[in-house]
Amino acid sequence: MMIQDWMKYLEPLLKLYGKRKHPLNYKNRYQLLIMVILSAQDSDKHINELAENFFNVYPSLEFLAKALPEDLHQYIGSVRNFGNKSEWIVKLAKTISCDDKIPTTLDDLIKLPGIGRKSANVIIRESGTKAEGIIVDLHVIRVAPRIGIATGVQPERIEKQIMAIVPQEKWNEVGMAISFLGREICRPTNPNCNICVMNVVCNYYNELAKRPAI
């Protein structure tokens, strides 16, 4: 389906999810930075469960900068790729040195170990600073082609396509809104299409409607 005015159809989605806080239960930008790194290839739920113990021991970058990577293992040993993540976290703590110096621009964030474009966009969005890109996580990679706002499976390609459609002042909202849709409604299997606010334009739903009943 060719859509001329995507913002018209995205408005209900943005109203539902656009301002919702990220599922990581962080209390400040330092915690957000560390939890975003830990959550890569892991679940937000898992990171939330271990965060309290970790931050009780390492309440700031200053404390973390004094640690060795192996010191972190007892707190994050259940996290996927914990060995590399321990190295990255200690290295960035020594690089930034204090919480007030945590960057909030895309170029500066992606220079940090363990921070890619998606993670940087999450930090920018949650910090409330001007968007420079759009969050494209695994949920967005699945949902965006389903509803028809993007094609392909490459994150940067999907991001560029959505950026070309959505005005910049909505970039911080739209990626996370699509992600929440994927988490709650547009699941990998048995998506709840009948209650989805995007089913009016959704390619997946419209194709599903054409299939003969079994």
Regions found by a protein language model. Give the residues of each.
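Catalytic cores of DNA base-excision repair glycosylases
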Residues: I3-I214
